[in-house]
């Protein structure tokens, strides 16, 4: 040790303390002057007008013209993702009452451009089941927001519509089942009754009745700044009808996800239970947080539990409410609504 440090230890210690204190003050001052990164504002691009297809592309196959002579019965899944996770857009293209598949034909994928028009993302070709898949990687995702999609058959200009929703990671969601949860009847109760249940809905002969307070609870959750997910065991053929029903009944807008395969409709854990579980887990993998979930069936309880939704935030209507420590709703939402209104709005990583 040097003579100076030996002779003046107090002075040296005092100087060192002052230096550290000064450095801390400078760092704190710098942090105070550095603005926090602003939360992104959600864009809502849902008012664009899709121009009429002026020139149809020639059909790849002569048989396609015959198939397309029936009424278009196309469908497409809504897409929900975060800014850090690419997605695959999917659609199913068929015609007529027998739902004849459109095979090996081109479909153009368009997105609302936020300026009153649509822009093309590219094209895809249907497979032998009438389906298309179109990958949209993370770099091509639009800014956080809600965007209308149009999947247009190039041969005749018919369209399947869907919505793309993009949020920052750690966005908190609320999930709703539909049949038996928002409606008074459940298609999942008896496997043998599935066809009988869905056929009147498909034909338009029956309009499902909503549970008392169901519209209000979705409106409340939306007002609390939760994006909503409508997760149902309904088959893809009911996509358009289900969207229309949610809209005309006054339910808050949300992401609709239906089954893609007949096995997923089955009212068992291995059927609709696994379908819902896997979809919810895919949302978690994309960076979402499942804040609460509403259902009515044991398959809902299974799926929500498997996706790690807390039983205290799992609300079950009907006779299964309370099972597995879930929260019973009874036959309506009148008791639940006042309690839900007391909840503070969540901290979300976006602003509207």
Which ranges hold each PLM region?
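Bacterial N-terminal signal peptides
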Residues: 14-24
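Bacterial N-terminal signal peptides that target proteins for export
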Residues: 2-15
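Domain-length accessory/inserted modules outside core catalytic folds
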Residues: 198-200
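Asp-based phosphoryl-transfer active-site loop
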Residues: 173-187, 304
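C-terminal cap/substrate-recognition subdomain and adjoining C-terminal extension
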Residues: 33-64, 113-119, 187, 193, ...
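Intrinsically disordered, serine/threonine/proline
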Residues: 24-163
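Peripheral membrane interaction modules
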Residues: 160, 174-176, 193
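Short beta-strand edge segments in extracellular beta-sheet folds
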Residues: 163-169
């Amino acid at each position: 040790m040097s003579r100076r440090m030996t002779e003046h230890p107090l002075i040296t210690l005092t100087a060192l303390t002052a230096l550290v204190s000064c450095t801390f003050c400078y760092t704190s001052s710098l942090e105070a002057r550095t603005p926090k990164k602003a939360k992104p504002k959600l864009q809502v691009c849902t008012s664009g007008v899709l121009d009429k297809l002026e020139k149809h592309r020639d059909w790849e196959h002569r048989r396609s013209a015959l198939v397309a002579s029936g009424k278009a019965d196309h469908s497409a899944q809504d897409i929900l993702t975060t800014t850090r996770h690419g997605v695959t857009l999917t659609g199913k293209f068929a015609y007529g009452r027998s739902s004849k598949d459109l095979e090996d034909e081109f479909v153009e994928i368009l997105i609302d451009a936020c300026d009153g028009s649509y822009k093309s993302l590219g094209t895809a070709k249907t497979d032998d089941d009438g389906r298309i898949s179109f990958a949209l990687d993370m770099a091509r995702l639009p800014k956080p927001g809600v965007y209308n999609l149009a999947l247009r058959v190039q041969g005749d200009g018919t369209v399947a519509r869907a919505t793309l929703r993009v949020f920052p990671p750690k966005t908190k969601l609320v999930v709703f089942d539909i049949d038996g949860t928002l409606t008074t009847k459940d298609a999942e109760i008896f496997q043998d009754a599935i066809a009988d249940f869905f056929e009147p809905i498909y034909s338009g002969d029956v309009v499902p009745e909503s549970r008392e307070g169901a519209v209000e609870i979705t409106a409340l959750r939306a007002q609390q700044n939760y994006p909503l997910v409508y997760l149902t065991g309904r088959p893809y053929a009911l996509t358009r009808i289900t969207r229309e029903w949610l809209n005309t009944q006054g339910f808050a807008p949300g992401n609709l996800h239906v089954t893609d395969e007949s096995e997923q409709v089955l009212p068992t854990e291995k059927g609709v239970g696994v379908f819902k579980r896997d979809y919810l887990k895919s949302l978690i993998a994309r960076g979402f947080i499942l804040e609460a979930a509403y259902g009515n069936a044991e398959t809902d309880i299974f799926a929500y539990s498997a996706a790690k939704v807390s039983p205290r935030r799992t609300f079950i209507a009907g006779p299964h409410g309370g099972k597995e420590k879930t929260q019973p709703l009874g036959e309506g939402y009148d008791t639940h609504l006042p309690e839900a209104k007391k909840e503070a709005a969540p901290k979300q990583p976006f602003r509207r």
